[in-house]
Regions:
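Short coil-to-beta transition motif at edge beta-strands of beta-rich domains
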Residues: 2-16
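Short beta-strand-centered aromatic/proline hotspots
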Residues: 11, 18-35
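Intrinsically disordered, low-complexity regulatory segments enriched in Ser/Thr/Pro
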Residues: 90-123
């Protein structure tokens, strides 16, 4: 994953799987904050496309539920699990396959009478954050926790 593909506040990991939140992005480098359990910055970590590149954080049901998404057991079929998020005027549905299946993610956005569905080949936290920002849900995207 290249640094310029990311945005401020995106969640990434280092090569050891330690999650961090991006705080600075350049053309080929990025800086991420290491947060403690209370969400306080403990230190910063530098990433570079040529030496120490960032890795994506795999999206899971646990991460979704930490961020206000609700698991819909009645919509689960063929190994696909569904979660929903509603803030009053916007309703989102997200489908993730079982761990054994391909890492495909489907997001359904509904607002008033409009709806839009997008399929992604990978289920990563930063991809969900980017899509939430496209829907105008910047606060939800920027304040995600892993």
């Amino acid at each position: 994953m290249k640094c310029k593909e990311l945005m401020i506040y995106d969640w990434i990991e280092d090569r050891n799987g330690f999650p961090m939140k991006l705080s600075l992005i350049g053309e080929t480098h990025a800086c991420a904050a290491v947060l403690d359990v209370a969400g306080v910055v403990g230190s910063y970590w530098d990433f570079d496309d040529n030496f120490n590149e960032p890795y994506p954080v795999k999206l899971s049901g646990e991460i979704l539920e930490k961020n206000g998404w609700v698991f819909n057991e009645e919509k689960m079929n063929y190994g696909v699990k569904c979660w929903s998020y509603c803030d009053g005027e916007v309703k989102l549905s997200l489908s993730l396959p079982d761990e054994d299946d391909k890492e495909r993610m489907v997001i359904l956005y509904e607002r008033f009478l409009d709806s839009d569905s997008i399929v992604y080949d990978n289920a990563y936290v930063h991809i969900l954050q980017h899509q939430l920002r496209c829907y105008g849900l910047n606060e939800l995207a920027d304040n995600m926790v892993v």
